[in-house]
Amino acid sequence: MTPPHSDRPEDTADPKLLEILVCPVTKGPLELDGARRELISRSAKLAYPIRDGIPIMLPEEARKIE
């Protein structure tokens, strides 16, 4: 089994893709948290997971943050 926070290249999203993605809830900017493999929307207070290099931009899949 792979550790939840590995440094495999496939665990991070394509930087070009990250430049154009916005939060689907607020349409605001996202910040990459490479250590957690998440895209953070500060305005929506949500963290979207990146799985196998693919950002999962579904609000129901996002983790709530404070």
Curated annotation (Swiss-Prot):
Transmembrane segments: none annotated. One of its GO terms (cellular component) is cytosol. Signal peptide: none annotated. HAMAP family: UPF0434. Belongs to the UPF0434 family. This is UPF0434 protein Nwi_0075.
